[in-house]
Amino acid sequence: MYGMDDEGIFEQLFKLLQSSGPVNWNLAREVTKSLAGPQQLIDPEVAEEYRELAHVSEVRISSVTDLPSPAPGELNPTDRATWAAENQQSFRVLVEPLSEKLTGLTDSDSLRDIPELGGMGAMGSMLAPLGPALLGVQAGTMVGFMSHRALGQFDTGIPAMDHDRPYVIVPNLDDFAIDHGIDHRQVRLWGALHEVTFHRIMAVEWIRGRFVELVEAFYETVEFDMSDLMGKLSAMQDPEAMQRMFGADEDATGLLKATSDSSRLADIQAFTAFIEGYADRVVSMAGAELLPGIDRIEEAFNRRRTEPNKAEQFLQEFAGLELERWRAKDAARFCDEVVERWGEDALAKVWDDPTYMPTVAEFSDPIGWNARVLLDESALGND
């Protein structure tokens, strides 16, 4: 494209920026492909080992939890590029609700208020689809970054919307084992246990709907700061700058910045942390007899959650959504204390109703949670 004249570049960009929906998923796919990299072949023997470990995991998990057991989906041991392609829209709940806000900010009336954008020729006709294009860039960048970080669906911190297929991203699990000096076979079993556990949690009938409700409530409070974006648009001196802005490079990661309501953010943080913390506890119990190195694996994984990474930093900057996944450790301690005080059945009550999930404050106050959930329910039963 760089060899074309200005009008040729604009024509190509115009085609890429076209979208019939709130998000330009064609542009998202291009950005994701660029970031995820080329496909890698997965050793068939390793893939088969993962599938066998998933069957072992199903049996072990059934022995330690009453979580619903959906029809087991075949575990997909895959590479980064394939995972990214098959999950391109799995996290659309984090992007699509923002389209209405952007529509108001990028309509023709708003853009006419920017003197520097006047008289820019072909660029003016490209600004109409700016909102869907911006969201496409953000969606593609988010999934592209995730593909290099996530160990499986369980390690995204976010329920997938499009499908129920369990995945492990083999190169990332291999890197995790190497980075922490842990036996590959133990990491593979641990990864399979986590993915199967997450798959079961996602089978709770209200889980995905509740997450959507929390995200939509949170996004009602999000306000975008468009100054950086408009500054880039007004400062453009050539068409290649426009091309770079919608490419998979550092220019794309800071197009939008958002502020949001901290209390509604805490609701999402509690939701995702509890799912991860509960899963940690299940995996720890299910793998105790099979994984002599489970303490090292869990320590490394918890430490990893506290480390900054591009996917989560991008999500925080783009939408103001900071998951604070390190809270999973607090949630796991909450689970342990509830079971110690009131038994496994008390903890299992969480899955009966979305309002029974603990808040961030209740992670350190299980007695308060008990008073809100268990005692209130007991009182209702005696009426």
Residue ranges of predicted features:
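Pan-zinc metallopeptidase signature
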Residues: L255-D383
